[in-house]
Amino acid sequence: MKSVQTVSPIYLGFASQKGGVGKSSLAEVLASILYYEKGIPLAVVDCDGTQESFYKLRERERNIIDESPDIAEQLKAFFSKFGKRAYTIFRTKPEEALIQVKQLLTQTEEDIRLVIFDFPGHAGTTELLNLSLEMDYIISPIEADPQSLVSSFAYAKTVRDLGISLEDARIQDLLLLWNKINRSASTVVIDHYSDYAKSEDINLFDTRIYHSVKFARELAQGGVKGVFRSSYLPPVASLRTGTGVNEWVEEVCRRFKISTE
């Protein structure tokens, strides 16, 4: 989109124009892998006032920990070895998100290098468009549904055009991400819209995320040794096989210049 010097921390937004495309699940998985495995100091801002998926995930996990001595003991051992607390998650309104983040950054002693924003399910309002332009990067998951793809591409083009035309806009790039792909289904829609994205100069991740019931496995279902979606643990490595998650995380780090050193 455009090349500007990225300031620290990097602001990374997750936005979609349709509910149920896996936006929050992907944000949760990315945050936990980057923080717990790759050592990236980060914080999460849940702006999705209607769902609050990220914030409510943490709340559910706290309840499970309170109710299960075994899980509590295993997590205690994990964090004792990890040497740090869980990353911060706070909820706020979209129009207050940036102010809240700045307050957090001035109050914390941790050198936060990445802030992940989970946007509401419909990112088309004025407040959300303004917030979009204040991100460094946006990840927008899409599914092979022509009706929802129209609005997703319209949002991507709006952010791109405003990001280029407004000199003070922070946004550097928005990337679409094919998500929940059925391996046995036809790729006609995916191929068509991938070509369309190229023709419109809209960036797509090379990696694709494949449909899997494993994304729904929280602490309550899988326990510490079988969890996929958690704010306290990264997805169990063996469960990621075939999902595209590992490849996607590596591409995120490369494209957004998130150093793991």
State what each model feature region is:
Residues 1-5:
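Pre-Walker A adenine-sensing motif
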Residues 7, 15-21, 35-115:
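P-loop/Walker-type NTP enzyme "switch/lid" segment
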Residues 25-26, 30:
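Hydrophobic positions on the alpha1 helix immediately C-terminal to the Walker A/P-loop
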Residues 31, 35-36, 132:
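Gly/Ala-rich phosphate-binding loop of Rossmann-like dinucleotide-binding domains
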Residues 126-146:
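Inter-motif core of Ras-like GTPase G domains
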Residues 152-168:
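Conserved C-terminal guanine-recognition region of P-loop GTPase G domains, centered on the G4
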Residues 180-229:
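Beta-strand-loop-alpha "switch" segments that mediate conformational coupling across diverse proteins
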Residues 215-249:
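Inter-lobe coupling/hinge region of RecA-like P-loop helicase motors
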